[in-house]
């Protein structure tokens, strides 16, 4: 019996920019040979808003409300790096209490970021149930932010040069501890539901593998880097804010696949809860209501009015000038290394403001990862990278 062999032509399809699995306005031009991906070209820029140029025409205080729109799932990290850049350039010291408040806000944001990654990632691979669970926990974090800053997801406008805008409100520390007590068992629930699920494991194990050398050469950061066997976390490396005061571990894996990236993020949420608990317990002056009571009892010359018990070093004037010089500042966000290169020329506006976003760099490896995989694995691999297009395009 003669066998007829057919040769198919490669097919080019567009995924996005409006597809729900694209995690924003990302367009992928995918070349397929049957079910196999031959090539993939990401098309970005649909959400470009000129954030760097806006920064060069605004004072720092005017610019802080803009920055929560870079990565709108990690507004606190954007605000932190925005004030850290002129702080380092002008050598401004931040009170210890303000540093502790900053760390609490950043770690709450890390949890919220990982939760917002977890739900859609699992929905991409076919697990719909956790998508609804994660919003329940995120709402509690937003309630805490609303009590402290007046806003929820974005526009917190909380970080300031030299500290934070206002102290934590009455009873906030207790509410935050209640959230920690509530959230820890929920992470265990996620693990029971997801980690050993055979369908989930089949979809993500061995898929989108990145070796240690590839992760370094492609300049990956955050969970993408740590899941490939590189134990690198800027909170440990750069010793910024007051992370050295706390007992916590860098979470990392060696497999480098989608499953390893999932494990790193799940464990990081536990570490964040651990850091928040220690920060609440060790905060100089304690809860706001206790600190105010001590100040009232001991009068104006009380030691509780010292520098380290303040929420801000000194309120910066609208005419604050960024000194001459240049500096690169970075921090560890939920997605990886967020950096700012700032160049000042003794003006109220920075002369140059360069943003280094984590997911822009992490997204570059996508065409390399997708070559040779099946169409169904595109969503799992893209979802495991964790991109927000507001941050990629800026």
From Swiss-Prot:
InterPro entries: NADH_Q_OxRdtase_suD, NADH_UbQ_OxRdtase_49kDa_CS, NDH1_su_D/H, NiFe-Hase_large. GO terms for molecular function: NAD binding; oxidoreductase activity, acting on NAD(P)H, quinone or similar compound as acceptor; quinone binding. One of its GO terms (biological process) is photosynthesis, light reaction. Its EC number is 7.1.1.-. Keywords: Membrane, NAD, NADP, Plastoquinone, Quinone, Thylakoid, Translocase, Transport. It is a peripheral membrane protein. GO terms for cellular component: plasma membrane-derived thylakoid membrane. It is an enzyme of class 7 (translocase). It catalyses: a plastoquinone + NADH + (n+1) H(+)(in) = a plastoquinol + NAD(+) + n H(+)(out); a plastoquinone + NADPH + (n+1) H(+)(in) = a plastoquinol + NADP(+) + n H(+)(out). It is found in: Cellular thylakoid membrane. Pfam families: Complex1_49kDa. Signal peptide: none annotated. NCBIfam families: PRK06075.1 (NF004739), PRK07415.1 (NF005649). NDH-1 can be composed of about 15 different subunits; different subcomplexes with different compositions have been identified which probably have different functions. NDH-1 shuttles electrons from an unknown electron donor, via FMN and iron-sulfur (Fe-S) centers, to quinones in the respiratory and/or the photosynthetic chain. The immediate electron acceptor for the enzyme in this species is believed to be plastoquinone. Couples the redox reaction to proton translocation, and thus conserves the redox energy in a proton gradient. Cyanobacterial NDH-1 also plays a role in inorganic carbon-concentration. Belongs to the complex I 49 kDa subunit family. This is NAD(P)H-quinone oxidoreductase subunit H.
């Amino acid at each position: 019996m003669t066998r007829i062999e057919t040769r198919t032509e490669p097919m080019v399809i567009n995924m996005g920019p409006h597809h729900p699995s694209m995690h924003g306005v990302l367009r992928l031009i995918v070349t397929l040979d049957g079910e196999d991906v031959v090539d993939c070209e990401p098309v970005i820029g649909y959400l470009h808003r000129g954030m760097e140029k806006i920064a060069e025409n605004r004072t720092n205080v005017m610019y802080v409300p803009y920055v929560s729109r870079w990565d709108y799932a990690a507004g606190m990290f954007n605000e932190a790096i925005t004030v850290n850049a002129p702080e380092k350039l002008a050598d401004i010291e931040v009170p210890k209490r303000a540093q502790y408040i900053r760390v609490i806000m950043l770690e709450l944001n890390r949890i919220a970021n990982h939760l917002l990654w977890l739900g859609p990632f699992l929905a991409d691979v076919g697990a719909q149930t956790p998508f609804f669970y994660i919003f329940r926990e995120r709402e509690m974090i937003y309630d805490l932010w609303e009590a402290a800053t007046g806003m929820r997801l974005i526009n917190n406008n909380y970080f300031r040069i030299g500290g934070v805008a206002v102290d934590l409100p009455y009873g906030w520390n207790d509410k935050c501890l209640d959230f920690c007590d509530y959230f820890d068992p929920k992470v265990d629930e996620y693990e029971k539901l997801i980690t050993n699920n055979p369908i989930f494991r089949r979809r993500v194990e061995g898929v989108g593998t990145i070796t240690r050398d590839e992760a370094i050469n492609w300049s990956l950061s955050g969970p993408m880097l740590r899941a490939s066997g590189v134990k690198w976390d800027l909170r440990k490396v750069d010793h910024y804010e007051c992370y050295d005061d706390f007992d916590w571990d860098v979470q990392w894996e060696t497999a480098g696949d989608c499953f390893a990236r999932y494990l790193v993020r799940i464990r990081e949420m536990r570490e964040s809860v651990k850091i928040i608990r220690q920060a609440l317990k060790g905060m100089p002056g304690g809860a706001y209501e206790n600190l105010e009571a001590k100040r009232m009892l001991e009068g104006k010359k009380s030691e509780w009015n010292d520098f380290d018990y303040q929420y801000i070093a000194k309120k910066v004037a609208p005419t604050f000038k960024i000194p001459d010089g240049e500096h690169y500042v970075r921090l560890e966000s939920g997605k990886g290394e967020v950096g700012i290169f700032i160049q000042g020329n003794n003006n109220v506006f920075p002369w140059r403001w360069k943003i280094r976003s984590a997911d822009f760099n992490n997204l570059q490896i996508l065409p390399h990862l997708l070559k040779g995989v099946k169409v169904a694995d595109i969503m799992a691999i893209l979802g495991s990278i964790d991109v927000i297009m507001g941050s990629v395009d800026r």
